[in-house]
Amino acid sequence: MPTVLLTGFEPFDGDTSNPSWTAVQEVRDRWDGDAEIQVRQLPVDFAKVDDALRAALAEVDPDVVISVGLAGGIETLEVERVAINVDDARIPDNTGFQPIDEPVVDGGPAAYFSTLPIKAAVAAVRTKGIPAVVSQTAGTYTCNHVFYLLMHELRDRPGTRGGFVHIPYSTEEAIGTDRPYMRMDQLATALTAVVRATLANATDVKVGSGSLD
């Protein structure tokens, strides 16, 4: 039976919750498929997140890794295509550290591509009536940092596939604000569809999912 590792982040930027962590726990708790789901929370801390991710990989020894993060302002689930070797933080992390134009990995390649079936995953989410797209940038904050480091670490795990998914706020974080959001049950359903599509597709489907901007 394959093992799937899902990671989410702790709260940051003044929020008291992070939907990425809540959502991956919901996926685990609702899961009834032919795979084991493990979840781990990662810190929003550039200095500590590397060791936390490496420890999770060593402990779980997964066949699939899907890291999940919050992108405030988006309205759809975004399955990321590429991670770049740049930390350029618009805001400080939870310790007050704010790297600007620093590499994620010294001497690492400029970018890594996801090894998830990203287009099949987007299609699977859409069949649930939930909007989803292939995203061409994971930003330059801790989400991209984790995505890049994950793919860098997976070079030594050729049998393990990995990638990153951005989600919007959930209802909990959006109350009393004008933030776009999805209900938590929608987020969990969408991420479950991503997991199932990944397990069902060893290679991706050939459909156009590019961007003109």
Swiss-Prot record:
Catalyzed chemical reaction(s): Release of an N-terminal pyroglutamyl group from a polypeptide, the second amino acid generally not being Pro
Domain of life: Bacteria
Entry's localization field: Cytoplasm
EC numbers: 3.4.19.3
GO cellular component: cytosol
Enzyme kind, highest EC tier: hydrolase
SUPFAM superfamilies in the cross-refs: Pyrrolidone carboxyl peptidase (pyroglutamate aminopeptidase)
Keyword tags: Cytoplasm, Hydrolase, Protease, Thiol protease
Pfam families reported for this sequence: Peptidase_C15 (PF01470)
Catalytic-site annotation from UniProt: 80, 143, 166
A GO MF label: pyroglutamyl-peptidase activity
Gene Ontology BP annotations: proteolysis
Alphabetical list of InterPro entries matching this protein: Peptidase_C15, Peptidase_C15-like, Peptidase_C15-like_sf, PGP-I_bact-type
Function: Removes 5-oxoproline from various penultimate amino acid residues except L-proline.
Self-association and partners: Homotetramer.
Similarity remark: Belongs to the peptidase C15 family.
Stated name of the protein: Pyrrolidone-carboxylate peptidase
Annotated source species: Clavibacter michiganensis subsp. michiganensis (strain NCPPB 382)
High-level lineage: Bacteria, Bacillati, Actinomycetota, Actinomycetes, Micrococcales
